[in-house]
Amino acid sequence: MEIHPLGPAQTDDAADLFGSNASTRGCWCMWFLLPVRDVQAGWGDTNRGRFEMLATETSPPGGLLAYQDGKAVGWCAMGPRTRYPRAAGSKLMAQRDPDEDADVWFVPCFFVRTGSRRAGITEQLLRAVVAYAGEHGATAVEGFPLAGDGPHKTDRYLGTEPLFAACGFTAIARPTPRRVIMRRELAY
């Protein structure tokens, strides 16, 4: 398995990966970046164009791609909380310290290609995000995955509490019965 940051050279690989699923084919990982009406109005090609701009004009990169045998099989969005205004401003994150938004990185979503799931790709991506964020000056990494370890039929793109815990994250808040804020402090 190889993991690479999103850049211009990876946009075709991301298109192939996202094209394998109706949700990712429409959203293009814009859900937490833009107002809902803009994401929905841009469903498909417009969101793809926005994603390609993210790949070419954003630093740090908008996420990481996991490759197996030269084919993109997984994705994890990442970046400073300032990049994700919908997430940072949500009721789930109401207790966050906004003064940390530039230094604390956020992991809003994952996607793994059908046929490659349940192989540990998401965990490898999350571990790579932690390392990458630390190398680029982040003081912590957060996510708001699904709480517990029950069978979740929806919202798995957020990750799960056991996934984050396995990667050294600690629960810092439980804003709803279904969601938990997980955080990993970085000492780099």
Predicted regions and their residues:
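Short hydrophobic/aromatic beta-strand or adjacent loop that forms the aromatic wall/cage
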Residues: 61, 177-182
